[in-house]
């Protein structure tokens, strides 16, 4: 019985929202890979997405905190020699380090899934994850020319 935390990002508003996904909806995510898209209507209980919107899986992390890596096939846990993101940001150019990562496939051992909303072509409506009151206030002050 898998349970996931889905972190859904909205490219229009720049905001992200976290949802807890439980069975039977969680079963729809099992077996998906990084880069796969699924219909946005699966989240109708949590968020109202525009018609035709999709959700693209961009990553995630396992129980132990290891990030999912798009270059490691399957739902496995492996050590890789990393020279850059995801999973390792070298302090100097050319440095490499052996890091533990998860594969690119979602399984029961994944606890967090990162995803982004893919809007239909030519969409010009409001964002699915709206700005908060403080952000709107900052934007209106900046537009008027007064310091925030």
UniProtKB/Swiss-Prot annotation:
The lineage of its organism: Archaea, Thermoproteota, Thermoprotei, Thermoproteales, Thermoproteaceae. It comes from the Archaea. One of its GO terms (cellular component) is ribonucleoprotein complex. This is Small ribosomal subunit protein eS6. NCBIfam families: PRK04290.1-2. The keyword Ribosomal protein applies. One of its GO terms (molecular function) is structural constituent of ribosome. Pfam families: Ribosomal_S6e. GO terms for biological process: translation. Keywords: Ribonucleoprotein, Ribosomal protein. Belongs to the eukaryotic ribosomal protein eS6 family.
């Amino acid at each position: 019985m898998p349970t996931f935390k889905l972190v859904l990002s909205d490219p229009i508003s720049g905001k992200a929202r976290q949802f807890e996904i439980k069975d039977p909806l969680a079963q729809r995510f099992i077996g998906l890979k990084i880069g796969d898209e699924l219909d946005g209507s699966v989240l109708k209980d949590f968020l109202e997405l525009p018609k035709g919107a999709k959700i693209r899986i961009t990553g995630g992390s396992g129980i132990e905190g290891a990030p999912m890596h798009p270059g490691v096939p399957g739902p496995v846990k492996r050590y890789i020699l990393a020279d850059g993101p995801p999973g390792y940001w070298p302090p100097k150019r050319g440095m490499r380090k052996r890091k533990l990562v998860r594969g690119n496939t979602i399984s029961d051992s994944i606890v967090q899934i990162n995803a982004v909303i893919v809007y239909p072509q030519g969409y010009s409506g409001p964002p699915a994850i709206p700005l908060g009151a403080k952000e709107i206030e900052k934007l209106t002050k900046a537009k008027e020319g007064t310091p925030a």
